[in-house]
Every structure is written in C-alpha cells, then in structure tokens.
C-alpha cells in the first residue's frame, strides 16, 4: 500500500484491481468449479457473501479512521483485535488455552503495541481526498483528533472478520479452499466496482489504468496469503494461529519499512520485535 502513495495511484481503483487479480488467481488455481446451483447450495455460501463484504467494509473503516484518528491509532486498533478471534477460539470453538500460551498472548499484545505504537511520528502519510468519502466526509483531521468511535469499529470489525474466516473454513469441510476464497474476493470486487463507479460519477477521481499495475502484485499476494491462512486454520487452533500471524505481519512490515522505505526503528520497535519472538515461542509450546 505504501507503493500506491509513492506512484500516486488511486487507492480505490488499485483496491478494485487487487480484488480482480485475487479472485482471478483463485479461479485459475482451483481444481473444480461449482455451477450456480451448486454454489448456492454450498454450506459456506451465505457466510462467504458476508465475508466478501466485510473485507472491503473494514478497508473503508481503516481509511476513514486513518484520516480522523491517525495511522498509529488505526494500526493498533486493527492488530489488537487479535483478542477477539483468540477468545472466540476458546468460547465458540472449544479450544484450550494453558497458562504458558496465555502469557505468550499477553506478551504478543505488548509486542504489537511497541512495534506499531513506538514509531517515529515525524512523518505523516499522504492521504487522498477521495478515500472513504461516505465515512470520512473528506474531513482531514489528522493525528490530533483522537476520535474513538472509528478505532473501536476497527477493533470489532477486524476481529469479526477473522472469526468469519474461521466460520467459513469450518463450513468448507474437506473441500479445496481455492474456489471458496476466489468467490469471497469476487464478492469484495463487486462492492469495489460500485465504489469506483461512485467516485467516477461524482467526479472524485479520474480513471487510471496504471492502478491496475498496483493491483496485480497486491492481489496475487493477498490471495496466496489468505489461502495459507485458511489452510493453517485446519492445522492450528485460533489461540495459536491468530496471535502468531499478527505478530508475523507486524514484524515483517516493520522490517520491510526499515529496509525498503528507510523508516527509522526506535528502541521500542526493537524491544517489541524481541518480545514478539518470545511470545511466539510461548504460544506455540505444547502443553
């Protein structure tokens, strides 16, 4: 997403193309296709509609929250939502959580706060004026306005999205995940097309073919990362998978920002990365 800013790509159009290539990759790699009648009869069909909508809904929430509450607050709200699928693993799915793993999850939350919240705040991101107009109302309030409602919605929205993914995985049974994931991204694509059409009709943006280039890489990466997460759900409990996954994403993002974008890591970031390693070890230890 940082590359979208560097090359001045339209966020909504690049996001739409991301869903085009994510869905396309899934359909090209799946082993079999459902007919329309078979698709509607799938036990995961209804949940996949909700999940596809939820993908793009949480994105709009995050862009609006970035405008109103700032990047740091938004990122923290998103990553700390790992608490919800972890609790759902215990309450809804009957998973067991021992003391060592619990301590690991607590350390994981501390690590997330340090890695995401301990960044140098001297640089502010460029925010497009057409981002989530219905939510943000083009109100560029920046870091100073700590609006609590949107970050709270991000927290519950992102956590709910993770739970929806687990529920769809359970409904899928032993079938190949490719077609289901491709269909979820296809639903997100339909909503993305509506958003881009709205921007173009209202004159909020102009059509950019170059946005497709940004969507190619992001879409293929998103599809395969989602495919890996869905298949990991078959091997690991929520209480292990989601904390480790979120720590991994945040750590890789921090290191990528340092290597590619010359971001300065503070001592809090380094401490957070060290704690993250300890947290992963504790969470994955067998009781």
Task: Annotate each predicted stretch with a short phrase.
Residues 12, 72, 98, 175-179, ...:
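Residues that define the loop-to-transmembrane-helix transition and helix capping
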Residues 27, 52, 56-60, 82-87, ...:
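Hydrophobic/small/kink-forming positions within alpha-helical transmembrane segments
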Residues 21-25, 77-91, 103-106, 187-191, ...:
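Alpha-helical transmembrane segments of compact multi-pass small-molecule transporters, enriched
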Residues 78, 94-114, 118-121, 147, ...:
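Loop-to-transmembrane alpha-helix entry segments
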Residues 4, 14, 65, 91-97, ...:
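Hydrophobic/aromatic residues within transmembrane alpha-helices
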Residues 1-49, 59-68, 119-152, 173, ...:
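Membrane-interface interhelical linkers
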Residues 16-17, 50, 77-80, 100-103, ...:
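Hydrophobic core positions of alpha-helical segments in small-molecule transporters
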Residues 144-170:
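Selected transmembrane alpha-helices and immediately adjacent juxtamembrane segments
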């Amino acid at each position: 997403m940082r590359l979208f800013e560097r090359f001045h790509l339209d966020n909504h159009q690049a996001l739409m193309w991301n869903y085009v290539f994510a869905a396309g990759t899934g359909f090209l790699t799946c082993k079999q296709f459902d007919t329309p009648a078979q698709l509607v009869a799938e036990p995961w069909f209804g949940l996949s509609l909700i999940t596809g909508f939820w993908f793009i809904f949480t994105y709009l929430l995050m862009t609006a929250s970035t405008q109103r509450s700032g990047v740091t607050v938004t990122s923290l709200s998103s990553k700390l939502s790992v608490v919800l699928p972890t609790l759902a693993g215990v309450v809804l799915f009957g998973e067991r959580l021992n003391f060592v793993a619990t301590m690991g999850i607590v350390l994981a939350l501390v690590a997330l706060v340090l890695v995401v919240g301990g960044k140098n705040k001297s640089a502010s991101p460029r925010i497009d004026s057409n981002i989530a107009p219905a939510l943000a109302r083009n109100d560029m309030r920046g870091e100073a306005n700590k609006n609590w409602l949107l970050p709270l919605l991000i927290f519950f929205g992102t956590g709910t999205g993770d739970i929806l993914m687990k529920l769809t995985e359970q409904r899928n049974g032993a079938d190949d995940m490719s077609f289901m994931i491709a269909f979820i991204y296809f639903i997100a694509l339909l909503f993305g097309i509506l958003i881009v059409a709205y921007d173009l009709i209202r004159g909020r943006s102009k059509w950019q073919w170059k946005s497709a280039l940004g969507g190619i890489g992001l879409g293929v990466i998103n599809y395969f990362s989602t495919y890996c997460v869905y298949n990991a759900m078959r091997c690991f409990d929520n209480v292990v998978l989601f904390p480790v996954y979120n720590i991994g994403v945040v750590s890789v993002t921090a290191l990528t920002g340092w290597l590619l974008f010359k971001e300065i890591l503070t001592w809090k970031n380094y401490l957070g990365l060290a704690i993250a390693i300890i947290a992963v070890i504790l969470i994955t230890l067998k009781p």
